[in-house]
Structure formats: structure tokens, C-alpha cells
């Protein structure tokens, strides 16, 4: 990136290529991990009942997309940092935390707190959506909010631009 900062476009084309490659690698990795959710949960939860294993797998499927969005947060954040734009990268996790806290408050308001003796038989898909989906939404927003300050920097896909290979 530093070498390409002297280019006429200040490294925008090189940055676009890196972002394309990074996005594709993170997307592929996330798809692989999601496809492996059931075997991973089976390996990590030895001795769990089939009901608990099923719930763990469903939660994993709701939460594993966070891998992609945390990766995008890091990738876009580093591009912003390299261009001296530190604020959004620093404050984006606050948005994630506010959404996560909101999801917990919503969950407690809709379903109440855990009580001794509660079991999985009473667990609903709505509880999963609010709890796991709410936290995943926070991570998605944490990444997506960084695209606002990124827009003015210039790294974006252009027709005719080859994302591969990345040459020095």
C-alpha cells in the first residue's frame, strides 16, 4: 500500500484489488465454516443431548455470518486508518454494543429472564432470532457503517479493473 501511495491514483486501484481479494477470501471462509456448522457443533459439544446439539447448531448458523462481517470491519477499518480516517473505525463497535444491548433488553422484555428449571422444550425460534439474530445484526452494522467514510476515499470496483493478480 505504501509503495502504491505514490501512484497517480494514490493506491486506489491497488486498494480495490486487495479489498476484492480480502472480501472473496472472507466470504469463502465464512461459507465453509457455515457448511461445517453441524460437524463443528457435534465435535465441540460431546455428550450433549440431541436437543441441545440442535439448538447449538441453529445458534451457530445465526452467528457464523459474523465471521465475514468482522473480517470486513477489519479490512475496511485498515483502509480508513491508512488514509488517516480513524473515527469511524474507533466508534463502530459502540454501534454493535448498543444493538447487542438492545437485543438483550428486547429478549428480556419479550421472554423474561432464565429461571431455574427452564428447559429447551419451551424454547422458540423467536427467542433464537431475537438473541442470535440481534447480535449478528450488531456485527453487520458495525461493518456496514464503515462504508460511509470509505466512499470518499476512492477505492471501489471499476469496470475493466482486474482484481487478480495483485502484482507488486
Language model segments and positions:
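Membrane-embedded alpha-helical bundles of multi-pass transporters/translocases
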Residues: 1-168
Amino acid at each position: 500500500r505504501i509503495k502504491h501511495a505514490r501512484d497517480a491514483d494514490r493506491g486506489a486501484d491497488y486498494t480495490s484489488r486487495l479489498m476484492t481479494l480480502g472480501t472473496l477470501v472472507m466470504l469463502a471462509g465464512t461459507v465453509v465454516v457455515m457448511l461445517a456448522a453441524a460437524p463443528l457443533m457435534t465435535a465441540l459439544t460431546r455428550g450433549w443431548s440431541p436437543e441441545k446439539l440442535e439448538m447449538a447448531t441453529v445458534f451457530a448458523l445465526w452467528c457464523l455470518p459474523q465471521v465475514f462481517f468482522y473480517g470486513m470491519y477489519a479490512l475496511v477499518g485498515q483502509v480508513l486508518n491508512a488514509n488517516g480516517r480513524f473515527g469511524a473505525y474507533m466508534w463502530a463497535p459502540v454501534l454493535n454494543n448498543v444493538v447487542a444491548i438492545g437485543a438483550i433488553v428486547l429478549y428480556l422484555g419479550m421472554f423474561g429472564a432464565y429461571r431455574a428449571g427452564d428447559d429447551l422444550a419451551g424454547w422458540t425460534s423467536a427467542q433464537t432470532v431475537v438473541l442470535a439474530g440481534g447480535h449478528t445484526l450488531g456485527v453487520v452494522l458495525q461493518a456496514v457503517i464503515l462504508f460511509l467514510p470509505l466512499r470518499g476515499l476512492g477505492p471501489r470496483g471499476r469496470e475493466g479493473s482486474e482484481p487478480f493478480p495483485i502484482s507488486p
